[in-house]
UniProtKB/Swiss-Prot annotation:
Cellular location(s): Cytoplasm
Motif 'KMSKS' region mapped to chain: 602-606
Domain notes: IleRS has two distinct active sites: one for aminoacylation and one for editing. The misactivated valine is translocated from the active site to the editing site, which sterically excludes the correctly activated isoleucine. The single editing site contains two valyl binding pockets, one specific for each substrate (Val-AMP or Val-tRNA(Ile)).
SUPFAM superfamilies: Anticodon-binding domain of a subclass of class I aminoacyl-tRNA synthetases, Nucleotidylyl transferase, ValRS/IleRS/LeuRS editing domain
Protein name listed in UniProt: Isoleucine--tRNA ligase
Binding site for ATP: K605
Organism: Histophilus somni (strain 2336) (Haemophilus somnus)
Known partners and oligomeric status: Monomer.
Function: Catalyzes the attachment of isoleucine to tRNA(Ile). As IleRS can inadvertently accommodate and process structurally similar amino acids such as valine, to avoid such errors it has two additional distinct tRNA(Ile)-dependent editing activities. One activity is designated as 'pretransfer' editing and involves the hydrolysis of activated Val-AMP. The other activity is designated 'posttransfer' editing and involves deacylation of mischarged Val-tRNA(Ile).
GO molecular function: aminoacyl-tRNA deacylase activity; ATP binding; isoleucine-tRNA ligase activity; tRNA binding; zinc ion binding
Length: 937
């Protein structure tokens, strides 16, 4: 017999070497949804402790970007890993469906409401458009491998959800948090509506930067305040600095800080009042060389001193405000109560009325002297001309600065006082309660707590009313004269909510007030406003979590969104839940950063660095996208590029190749009949299983702490170091050459089987498609579940027995020795002394500490070092230099004997058996005899 190929146990599996994910994943998805995988996961988890991750609804408009992919994949990894950790994890995806972006899109398609089509038809067009957008985004989320109740998502435009949003408004009213008032709010001229804090973006804008004189009504009074009677010469004025000249027509006061020192200063040929700390800066800005301090006083002493308006025929007082600082300007602040939050608050204390000069369209009303009918930004130059004309303009230049813009139109916005509905931060101690609740939440990363704490501490009252068509209406009736809410408001809200439940928000617009109010309809009218969309999404703790049966009345464990949501969804949810339930709506809040390219730049078409999620899964597969997400530290900016994705592909191939090796070497293994008990297994195999147990414990802990990059790193260490470059390399000889049903081989296959069962579960939350594929190739079991996703982490792993002399420390030491031997073998290969490692005979000269470890393996040490022969001698007898590993010296020679064509080991006994004259004695025992015996490796 000369052909011994059929006597070898060569690896064999149908599991392909190449993932070909882009092609295979859609078929797997079809199988998942044909067999209702999500419901199978839910059924398998029935009765277990619940973990609820409430999905923050993306906006139902436009195609998905990588930020969406990061968000949904992180959520999916959490839900799948929590299932594996023993939780029941219902996941209900949702969408935010009302609001301005959809209105604008629909306006472009069908025109504005009440122009070409009625408001009712316009709302239906918005509903249809949003539904279409949801379907498109849903298909993409599913393609990413995200499991959830996609057939029954929550939409904020669902009739039932709209009704619950109205009921939440009722609770806000019931608890005394709602009031109507005129306050400055962010106002978009293009939207003709107020904006929420989260709808404001800051972009650079060029604006006029001006210093303006307000002439003293009585110079003598001012001189006296500064103890400077008769000092200096020329006109005397208070100087303010502003970048919004258009707000000067609405000026009603000058604010100073009571605690600051102010000085009367001779600047050239005039006298001006400035904060002492800013005198030098203003002198430099005005480029005036002559300066003399005429007198000093505190802001407190200047209270109610009056100055002429720079171009109107009335005077304005100096008032005191804590918001005045010396960070810039002059230390005297132009105060227009209509156009600034601080201005409004401080003016209210002094009973100063708002001017009300700017209309909804951003133009000055017809009664405004000099500027009637002009747009506010157009009026800037006109105001400058007027200031020059009256001699009030001290200095003009143009500066580029950060300025608030509308998130949708990308155009500058203004602060404008309008009658709106607010949730008061101070009423019923809402701010104090919210700040207290923040402390009860686990924030991941931890800096999120300080961030939202500061935002809540400083935020103004929440303007929840909008002047829009497509939104949940503020279904209230107010008195025609007093603007007071109808006394039966709560009862009426519930009646309207029931109508909306059946017919949607159009039920409100179609409602005749007399139907509900009777005679009161003559003295009460409908509120025409809609709710801020952040009220919609912010109330989903009530409209979704408290209503959906799968959540069973449990409170939410986690909210997970991008870090911009501290001021968005996290904030609105916290405000509403605290206002209605006196508690935060979440126990944990996890935030991730934004996607940037490898140079840290934002994605933009102009830079050509935009990567679309579909581009990735169509080319590389969704598993590569998922692995990239899991591999990053999501707490900061998340870098992505084709190079980074290719790197994720390399990581993927290492994991896939490990899985393929495991499966190929389980060929012919039947766990029911071939499983070897741990105590009978060969030492190295027991150690390999214990390595898997250690890895699993670390992986479970990392999953539990949402440290997915740690999971990937631990997976790679296990696959590349502990398995790939050590264990799996060593066992090839035993796996391929020993008798097929020998203990030596079955012990090895038992280890491989345990490791495979564990590994497939480790990767399932991240590499979901690949895990599903591996699951189908594992050895059959009568009780094997159809899908890996219904399973918990594998509980069949075991550690080394305490009595086992060859413990983990032993094998870790051997791993180091083997790495050093490999280094020396590589040098011998480079020197052309040997080719493969099996052509070598290695003499290991070892110290007294290391030598006993090596000698414990006896003849089996050669299998660990993968050489044909190994001799161990005392280090003192070494005739070669000591190696890099202390206590070792290694000599490499060509192996004795001939190469066995079956096992490729060199042996001196080839030819001693006439019947098998070509192979070594070990192979003869494995082919003809009872099979070689192994104890250690």
């Amino acid at each position: 017999m000369t052909d011994y190929k059929n006597t070898l146990n060569l690896p064999e599996t149908g599991f392909p070497m190449r993932g070909d994910l882009a092609k295979r994943e859609p078929d797997m998805l079809k199988n998942w949804y044909d067999k209702n995988l999500y419901q199978k996961v839910r059924e398998a988890s029935k009765g277990k402790k619940t973990f609820i991750l409430h999905d923050g609804p993306p906006y139902a408009n436009g195609t998905l970007h990588l930020g969406h992919a990061v968000n949904k994949i992180l959520k999916d990894i959490i839900m799948k890993s929590k299932t594996a950790l023993g939780f029941d994890t219902p996941y209900v995806p949702g969408w935010d469906c009302h609001g301005l972006p959809i209105e604008l899109k629909v306006e472009g398609l069908v025109g504005k409401p009440n122009e070409k089509i009625s408001a009712a038809e316009f709302r239906q067009a918005c509903r249809d458009y949003a539904k279409e957008q949801v379907e498109g985004q849903k298909a993409d989320f599913i393609r990413m491998g995200v499991l959830g109740d996609w057939d029954n998502p929550y939409l904020t435009m669902n009739f039932e959800t709209e009704a619950e949003i109205i009921r939440t408004l009722g609770k806000v009213i019931q608890n005394g948090h709602l009031y109507k008032g005129s306050k400055p709010v962010h106002w978009c001229l293009d939207c003709a509506s107020s904006l929420a804090e989260a709808e404001v973006e800051y972009e650079d804008k060029v604006s006029p930067s001006i210093y303006v004189r307000f002439a003293a009504v009585s110079a003598a009074e001012v001189e006296e305040k500064f103890n400077a009677l008769g000092k200096g010469q020329g006109a005397l004025s208070a100087v303010i600095w502003t970048t919004t000249p258009w707000t000067l027509p609405s000026n009603r006061a000058i604010a100073v800080n009571a605690e600051l020192e102010y000085q009367l200063v001779q600047l050239g040929d005039e006298r001006v009042i400035l904060a002492a700390e800013l005198v030098q800066a203003v002198q430099n800005a005005l480029k005036i060389e002559q300066l003399e301090i005429l007198g000093s006083t505190t802001g407190q002493d200047l209270e109610l001193v009056r100055f002429h308006h720079p171009f109107y025929d009335f005077s304005v007082p100096i008032i005191l405000g804590d918001h005045v600082t010396v960070d810039g300007g002059t230390g005297l602040v132009h105060t227009a109560p209509d156009h600034g939050q601080d201005d409004f608050v401080v003016s209210k204390k002094y009973g100063l009325e708002m001017a009300g000069l700017v209309a909804n369209d951003g133009k000055f009303i017809s009664s405004t002297p000099f500027f009637a009918g002009k747009g506010v930004f157009e009026a800037n130059d006109l105001v400058l001309e007027k200031l020059k004309e009256t001699g009030a303009l001290l200095k003009l230049e143009r500066i580029k600065h950060s300025y608030p813009h509308c998130w949708r139109h990308k155009t500058p916005i203004i602060f404008r006082a309008t009658p709106q509905w607010f949730i008061g931060m101070e009423t019923q101690d809402l701010r104090i309660k919210a700040l207290s609740e923040i402390k009860s939440v686990r924030w991941i990363p931890s800096w999120g707590e300080a961030r939202i704490d500061k935002m809540v501490a400083n935020r103004p009252d929440w303007c929840i009313s909008r002047q829009r068509t497509w939104g949940v209406p503020m279904t209230m009736f107010v008195h025609n004269e007093t603007e007071e809410l109808h006394p039966r408001t709560l009862e009426l809200l519930e009646d309207i909510a029931k109508r909306v439940e059946k017919a949607g928000i159009q039920a409100w617009w179609d409602l005749d007030p007399a139907e509900l109010l009777g005679e009161d309809a003559k003295t009460y009218h409908k509120v025409p406003d809609t709710l801020d969309v952040w009220f919609d999404s912010g109330s989903t703790y009530a409209s979704v979590v408290e209503q959906r049966p799968e959540f069973n009345g449990k409170s939410t464990d986690m909210y997970l969104e991008g870090s911009d949501q501290h001021r968005g969804w996290f904030m609105s949810s916290l405000m509403l839940s605290t206002a209605t339930n006196n508690k935060a709506p979440y126990k944990q809040v996890l935030t991730h950063g934004f996607t940037v390219d490898e140079k840290g730049r934002k994605m933009s078409k102009s830079l050509g660095n935009v990567i679309v999620p579909s581009e990735v899964w169509n080319k590389n597969g969704a598993d590569i996208l998922r692995l990239w997400v899991a591999s990053t530290d999501y707490t900061g900016e998340i870098a992505v590029s084709h190079k980074i994705l290719n790197s994720a592909g390399d990581t993927y191939r290492r994991i896939r190749n490990t899985a393929r090796f495991l499966l190929a070497n389980l060929n012919g293994f039947d766990p029911k009949n071939d499983l070897v008990n741990p105590e009978e297994m060969i030492s190295l195999d027991r150690w390999a299983v214990s390595c898997a147990l250690e890895a699993q414990n670390e992986i479970k802990e990392a999953y539990d702490n949402y440290q997915f990059h740690t999971v990937v790193q631990r997976l790679m260490r296990f696959c590349s170091i502990e398995m790939g470059s050590f264990y799996l390399d060593i066992i090839k000889d035993r796996q391929y050459t020993t008798k097929a049903d020998s203990l030596a081989r079955r012990s090895c296959q038992t280890a491989l089987w345990h490791i495979s069962e564990a590994l497939v579960r480790w990767i399932a939350p991240i590499l979901s498609f690949t895990a599903d594929e591996i699951w189908g190739y594992l050895p059959k079991l009568d009780n094997r579940a159809e899908f890996v996703f219904t399973e918990e982490f594998y509980d069949g792993l075991f550690g080394l027995d305490e009595s086992d002399k060859l413990d983990d420390t032993y094998w870790q030491q051997l791993l180091k020795v083997r790495a050093e031997v490999n280094r020396v073998l590589e040098q011998a290969r480079n020197d052309k002394l040997i080719g493969a490692g099996l052509e070598a005979k290695v003499t290991v000269y070892a110290s007294e500490e290391i030598r006993p470890l090596l000698e414990q393996l006896g003849n089996e040490l050669r299998f660990v070092l993968i050489t044909s022969q190994v001799v161990v001698k005392p280090l003192s007898k070494a005739d070669v230099a000591e190696s890099e590993l202390t206590g070792l010296a290694i000599k490499v020679e060509r192996a004795d004997g001939e190469k066995c064509p079956r096992c490729w080991h060199f042996s001196t006994d080839i030819g001693s058996n006439k019947e098998h004259s070509h192979i070594c004695g070990r192979c003869i025992e494995n082919v003809e005899g009872n099979g070689e015996q192994r104890q250690f490796a």
